[in-house]
Amino acid sequence: MNIYTITPKYHITGVLKPESMTQLQRLGIVKVICNRPDSEAPLEEHSERMRSAVTEAGIAFEYNPVTMTSFSPELVRRQTDAVLNTNSGVFAYCATGRRCTMLWAFEFAHQRAPEDLI
């Protein structure tokens, strides 16, 4: 699994597998946010199966599915609240990591210099 650190608190990846929970625990992740709609995931990666794997590992789970055509202020706010209401490691995933990054950028990018974002 390729993990990308957007900030010390917010990490992303593309596809997350149930067998990756030990790695998330070692990273100190306390919340996982799934941005991948069930309609584009294989059955073994559907949100409820992932919720089970994540919560069995003692990590909180939130489902905030986003498609490239469904971005909305409400979805951005839900993602933002999930990050701000957590004191330490948040891990978001979708198919490639792009939507997780965009959700973060819509709310937080203005707080950083452009050269830090590129």
What kind of region is each of these model predictions?
Residues M1-F91, R99-I118:
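Cys-dependent protein tyrosine phosphatase-like superfamily
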Residues C94:
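Short cysteine clusters
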